Every structure is written in structure tokens, then in C-alpha cells.
Amino acid sequence: MVNETQKIMGDDSIQVTATTVRVPVFYGHSEAVNIETERKLSPDEARQILAKAPGIKVVDNPAKNEYPMPLDAAGQDLTLVGRIREDFSLPNGLNFWVVADNLRMGSATNAVQIAEILIRDYLRK
């Protein structure tokens, strides 16, 4: 996770600490994420920013016990984000919970996207 984050973001200076845990769920990946931003963001600002990002769905209504859960992500090409809250241990810190269907968002979706690019850019000429 550490190396992948730096590689995907193209920035070796990104500091990541990760712990991986395998739990018995049918499918899906879940992550507890803690970030520190350059400037202070309120949880509401973070929700608004994330809600505009392609492929992200904010599911964050603690009053109604609505949080991202692997079962809710199943069968979707979306990453669900919720439990967005301030991290009081960092000046500009936020915590949130992320879930996704790893079959759709992982290898299967990547394979389809690669095939689409091959067809569009190389096979339809």
C-alpha cells in the first residue's frame, strides 16, 4: 500500500503507514484512512470535494447510521467514502472510511478499461 500510493500519485515524498488485515467478508476492500492536508479542511468541505470526484459516492449520515459497508459497494463501480471526521491528533488531519468492490474496482474493471483503450486506440484504425 505504501509503494502503490507513492507510485500512483507519482510522489515518493508521500508518507504512508499501512496495516493490512484480512477479514471474512464475501468480497470488498475497506480502509480506514487518515490524511493530513496542506490547509485545514472541515469534514463538510471534505464531503463536498469528495462528492464531486468521479467514481466516489459519499455515504456519511451518522444520525441515521449510514456508513460505507462492503455489502453496499458490491456490484458497483464506485468507491464509497464516509465517517469523515476531524483527526484531532494532527493540525490539518482528517479520518474517513473507504469501501469498494475489489472485483469491479480492481482487476475486472482494470481489464475492461485496458480492453476499451486497446479497441479505441489500436484496433479501430
List each model region and its residues.
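C-terminal substrate-binding/catalytic lobe of Rossmann-fold NAD(P)-dependent oxidoreductases
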Residues: M1-N95
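NAD(P)-dependent Rossmann-like dehydrogenase/reductase catalytic/cofactor-binding core
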Residues: L78-L80, E86-K125
